[in-house]
Structure formats: structure tokens, C-alpha cells
Amino acid sequence: MNRTLQNQVKENLCPDGIWRLNDPMKSILRRQISHLPKSKVTEDETRYPGRPASMREFLIKFFARHYLQIQNSLIEYITTQDFYNIIRLGHLRILDVGSGPAVASLAITDMLVCLIEHLKSEGIWPRGKRVKIDYILNDTSGICLGTGKRMLTGYYKISRRNNREVVLGQIIDVRRGFPDNLNQLQRVRFNLGKYDIATFSYVLSPLSEEKGFNNLVLGLFDVEKLCNYSGRILVLQDKYRAGLVYRISRAIGISNTFEESIQEIYPKRGLCDIYPYWYYCFLYIPTKKMMVRQNFVA
């Protein structure tokens, strides 16, 4: 895995430095939006959809934004030897906390498909080798979990003609909110193996408000113990929560970065097609951080 490969994969996903949904993902998104009713919803309902109409607005306003920010944040990791060491074993496990309609899971899956295409063209990927992906979707909203499952299965149906290397494993939904669901997450980890990527996309603020700051931090520590030694934990939060981001950064002992993602807006909403978004990101290796913390405590 080298810088040239990373540039090739990034150019495919982010041509000319602009992150875009590819045609299959646009098709899946349009289909889901078309099947949902249109009615007036509040801003909070749009951000945290609990019924079909608010899910429709979330898909229009936030899906592409969050999806492309996930890809922007993970592009370097998926072209590392650490990630290759995971996928060459034929199994990837994604824990998607605050999954919404499986936004992070879909973004990671599409990146993996793109990566393997480039590995095949370079003669690096073994012929006939497959990667099974298991998804653990965690959200308290039934409409989010149901929509996420439909979009994941729709992605595999569309991509099956050109993609034989990435196959759908299990989709497990966990309805109980984080961190009260840690016993469930531990049982899933025991049955499937350690999580390779754990994502927390735009959930720090609601989790801190609902469960309390200390419980959120302790939950993040507990998730680290469930993760693969070559895996990553990814946390994203919007630029308006700087105070919360820095508190969590100090509490878990990990620095955050302030990222820019230049994206194509989709579906188009009568605005400029291309827009820059700024957000906070944590991306870290859980096992190394645990070792550092344990050594410090000792």
C-alpha cells in the first residue's frame, strides 16, 4: 500500500478535489427519497429523524454531507497496511453508532469496493478473494434502522454486476441507545469478532445531553476494548460544537482535527453545486491509545 495507490483511490472518489456521490449511490438515495412522504418537519426532526417525513428531509439535507465527510476522514486509513491486513483475511466488521440510515456503513463499503478495484488492477488483490462485511447498526429510531437496511441491501443489488469481491454478511440492528447498549455490543463482538471500524457520526452532542458527559466518555473507553488492534475509531462532529469537542478530546486523551471537505451537494437544492464543509474529526487507533493510558496510570 503506497501513496500512489492512495492518490488513485482518492481521485476516483474525489475527482479534482471535490467529493461526490457516485451514480449507484445517487440512484439508491433518489429511490429512498421518492418512497417517503413529504410534509413539514422541524430542524430537530430533520437532524434526528423518527418518522418517514423527517427521514425524507434528512436524506435530502444531510445524507450526502455526512457520507462524504466519512470518506474524506477515512481515505488515508483505508489505503494503509493496517486496513489491508484486515481485509485480506476476508472479513470486515463495522460498528455504526448513531447510524441513522447506515450513512457511515455505506460510505465505508463504497470506499472498500473502490479500493479493491484498484488493488485488482495493480495485480495485488488475489483472484477470487472476497471480503464479507458485517454491519452493526445502532440507532434508537426504527425508521433510521429500517431505511439503513434497505439502502445497504439496495447497494449490494446494484453493485453486484460489477463487484464480486465485497459481499454482504449480517446486518444487526441494536435499538438501545449508546452507552446503555454496551452489553449487547459486547455479545455481538463475542459472536462476530472484534470491530474493525467503529464510527460515531454527529452523535456526541445528543449523547452528551441525554446520557451525560461522563457516561459518554466511559462508553468511548469501553468501545476501545471491543476493537481490532489494526482498526480505528472515527468520531465526527459539526463545527458548532467546539466546546464539547475539546472537552471530549481532553477526557479521552486524543487530539482532534478541524477538517474541510469540498463536496457536491446532492440532491441539488437550488444552491451552488459545490460547497465546502468544516467539521471536527477524531480518528485513532484504540489499542495503542489504551496502552499509552495504561502505562501512564501505572
Regions found by a protein language model. Give the residues of each.
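N-terminal auxiliary segments of SAM/dcSAM-dependent transferases
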Residues: 1-41
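Domain-level detector for long C-terminal conserved domains
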Residues: 2-8, 142-298
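Class I SAM-dependent methyltransferase Rossmann-like catalytic core
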Residues: 44-86
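Phosphate/oxyanion-binding active-site loops and adjacent basic polyanion-contact surfaces
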Residues: 59-74, 100-108, 140-148, 212-215
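Active-site catalytic pocket residues across diverse enzymes, especially alpha/beta-hydrolases
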Residues: 77, 81, 112-116, 152, ...
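Conserved class I S-adenosyl-L-methionine
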Residues: 90-100
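Conserved SAM-binding loop of SAM-dependent methyltransferases across substrates and taxa
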Residues: 101-123
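Conserved SAM-binding motif I beta-strand of class I
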Residues: 134-139
